[in-house]
């Protein structure tokens, strides 16, 4: 299931190809135990499209599995940031999978500049998410949780027939950049400069800022976890996106908007109550969607202080359990078919 042979083969390319995936590395010194890998955590690579491999990780509960939760990480969210949440959801009886976008985290890169967010399309991420659900996890009930910029990827995957029982969108990004930025991106891409970083000073820096400084969380400890991992492991570093990625994301947002009415399963949107680009209109276009604001929170809900994260995590666990309870296996089938 974890494609260990592929992982080992690609690991051997690390010395010669900076685009190759990164499997496992150094734990940041002094990192609190709650941010370490959950018991039994394992890594794998998935490459269904013939493009760079996507990295994923998985951990399971100590007892019987009630449901599988597939987390689609956002831009610059390496899977390690989800260890604390994975452990909490494992304790509720869930197997937790975290899939990184191609070109992000430890996944393979399109560009030789590892800290450049580059992609010409997010369609490969849609195909990878579908393959993850159907070929790797391959069992129900399944809840998909998309973070930030992975929301349009998840919506397209579900609308195109990926078998799942619930969809959670946590602080979803469902709006493209402003028209002026998009216009400049299209002009530069047409001239062959789409690979350039949109913010010339936006490369990764060990000086930060960290997620608290960026206003993504109130928590000074959780706010430093991303920077800690990316400092310890250079392969995980990610700066600002290229012009091509900005266009690819805008295309994904427009495709998702066209698909929203075809999402057939329950959807839960969790976002701060004062989100400038709220997903409320998107939720209204999905037939079975509920939006629950997290009052006073900042966008990185999985990294928020307990005053907000506890409520967010409770909503995730409750929705996942309710969605799992709604799954009806086929006649003569089992609740959790054995994965392939």
Regions found by a protein language model. Give the residues of each.
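An N-terminal hydrophobic leader/cap segment in hydrolases
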Residues: 5, 9-48, 53-61, 338-340
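Active-site glycine-rich loops that stabilize anionic/oxyanionic intermediates
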Residues: 72-77
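Conserved alpha/beta-hydrolase
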Residues: 79, 86-111
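Alpha/beta-hydrolase active-site loop
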Residues: 115-135
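Alpha/beta-hydrolase-fold enzymes
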Residues: 149, 153-237
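Active-site nucleophile elbow and catalytic-triad environment of alpha/beta-hydrolase enzymes
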Residues: 240-259
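Short beta-strand/loop motif that positions the catalytic acidic residue
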Residues: 263, 269-271
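Catalytic active-site module of serine/aspartate enzymes centered on a nucleophile-bearing elbow/loop
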Residues: 289-340
């Amino acid at each position: 299931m974890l494609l260990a042979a592929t992982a080992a083969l690609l690991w051997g390319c690390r010395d010669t190809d900076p685009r190759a995936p990164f499997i496992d590395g150094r734990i940041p010194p002094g990192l609190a135990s709650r941010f370490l890998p959950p018991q039994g955590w394992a890594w794998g690579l998935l490459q269904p499209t013939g493009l760079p491999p996507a990295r994923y990780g998985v951990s399971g509960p100590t007892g019987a599995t009630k449901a599988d939760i597939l987390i689609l990480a956002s831009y610059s969210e390496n899977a390690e940031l989800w260890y604390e949440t994975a452990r909490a959801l494992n304790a509720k009886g869930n197997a937790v999978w975290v899939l990184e976008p191609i070109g992000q985290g430890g996944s393979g890169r399109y560009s030789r500049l590892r800290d450049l967010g580059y992609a010409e399309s997010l369609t490969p991420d849609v195909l990878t998410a579908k393959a993850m659900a159907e070929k790797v996890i391959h069992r129900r009930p399944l809840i998909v949780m998309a973070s930030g910029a992975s929301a349009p990827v998840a919506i397209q995957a579900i609308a195109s027939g990926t078998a799942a029982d619930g969809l959670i969108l946590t602080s979803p990004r469902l709006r493209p950049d402003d028209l002026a930025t998009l216009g400049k991106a299209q002009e530069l891409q047409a001239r062959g400069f789409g690979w350039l970083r949109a913010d010339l000073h936006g490369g990764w820096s060990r000086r930060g800022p960290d997620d608290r400084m960026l206003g993504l969380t109130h928590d000074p400890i959780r706010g430093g976890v991303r920077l800690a991992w990316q400092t310890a492991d250079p392969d995980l570093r990610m700066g600002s996106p290229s012009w091509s990625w900005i266009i690819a994301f805008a295309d994904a947002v427009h495709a998702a908007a066209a698909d929203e009415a075809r999402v057939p399963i329950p959807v839960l949107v969790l976002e701060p109550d004062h989100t400038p680009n709220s997903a409320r209109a998107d939720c209204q276009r999905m037939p079975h969607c509920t939006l629950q604001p997290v009052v006073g929170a900042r966008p990185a809900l999985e990294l928020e202080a307990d005053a907000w994260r506890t409520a967010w995590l409770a909503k995730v666990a409750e929705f996942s359990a309710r969605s799992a309870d709604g799954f009806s296996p086929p006649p003569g089938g089992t609740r959790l078919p054995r994965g392939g």
